[in-house]
Structures are given as structure tokens and as C-alpha cells.
From Swiss-Prot:
This is Small ribosomal subunit protein uS14. Transmembrane segments: none annotated. Part of the 30S ribosomal subunit. Contacts proteins S3 and S10. Pfam families: Ribosomal_S14. Binds 16S rRNA, required for the assembly of 30S particles and may also be responsible for determining the conformation of the 16S rRNA at the A site. GO terms for biological process: translation. Keywords: Ribonucleoprotein, Ribosomal protein, RNA-binding, rRNA-binding. Belongs to the universal ribosomal protein uS14 family. NCBIfam families: PRK08881.1 (NF006477).
Amino acid sequence: MAKISSVERNKKRERMAAQFAARRAKLKAIANNREASPEERFEASLKLAELPRNSAKIRVRLRCEVTGRSRGNYRKFKLCRNKLRELASQGQIPGMVKSSW
């Protein structure tokens, strides 16, 4: 099990990323627009830099939904490899069967 503080910190980052997503996308579009004047682009990049650091989606870490483990996760299931194996062997994941050839 991961520390509760690190899991909660990640949840806070997810909330902030969702909250600021529209504003961040709008500013990024202006900053990357070649048609806009250099002053507008520079102003947009300054406003983008003023946004909270944790509002960037890249700061969110993929964690296991069950244990909070940060490494060895499968995006499709949002589970770490350990819990995926455990739940699959119990038959809890629909359509997943043990491979044999």
C-alpha cells in the first residue's frame, strides 16, 4: 500500500488538472498560434506560467485504484500488475483468462 498522503496529493493534482484544463488549453492555443502577434503569444505564455504547477496534467501520476501503487500499472484496467494478476486468477476481470499455448 502506498502512503495515503501521496495518494491524496495525486487526487488533488487530478482535481486541479480538471479545473484548469480549459484555461490552460486556451492559453496554450494562443501561445502556439503563429498567426498571433509576438506580444499576444508572450502574454499568453506569462499567464500560463502563473497558473499553479499542479494544474498541469503531466503532474498527475497513474496509480493503482486498489493499492495506490505508482509503478507497474496497466492503463486499461487502472490496476497494478500484482492486483491485476490476483483479480484475474479469482475471475473478477471479465474476459481475462490465463494464457496457455
